[in-house]
C-alpha cells in the first residue's frame, strides 16, 4: 500500500481506500445507476473485507479489500478512464480516485464521493441452503453480467458455479479468480 494511505475509518473521518481492479470493475457492473435509493448508487466497503454492490434485483459480494474499517463505507466511483490498471485508490477528502498499474504508476484519474446512507444488510439476501428445481427463469441481461464478471475474474477459464434455491428464491453464482479473489452474485428469478 502506498505511503500515507490511511485506511481506518471513523464517522466523519476522511480516508483513502484501496481496491483491486477485479473488485472495482465487478462492483461497478452490479451497482444501481441513478436509483432513488441513493445508497445503492455506490460500492459498499465492509469491515470484514468484503465489497458489495446491488441494484435491488441482483447483488455482488466479493472479497477481499485490504482496508481496515469500523463500519460500512459507501463510495460512489466514476467509470475508469482506462482498463489497464491493477488497483485504484479512492480519496474521499479530495473526491479523486486514482488508477495505478502493477508498478504503482498512476495511469488515470476519476471522481469519487462518500455516500452518507445505510447499505442494505447484504447477508440477508444470500440463500442459506440450496433446493432442487426443474425450471427457473432469469432475466437474460442479468446472466450476461454474470458472464462478464466471470470473464473479468478469469479470462482463460470462465466458470460459474450456480447454487439454486428453488424456482422462487434467489440463485447464487460463485466466481473465483486465480489470484484468490472470489465473488458471489445473487440473482432473483423471474416468474414464468
What do these predicted regions represent?
Residues 6-192:
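DNA polymerase processivity clamps
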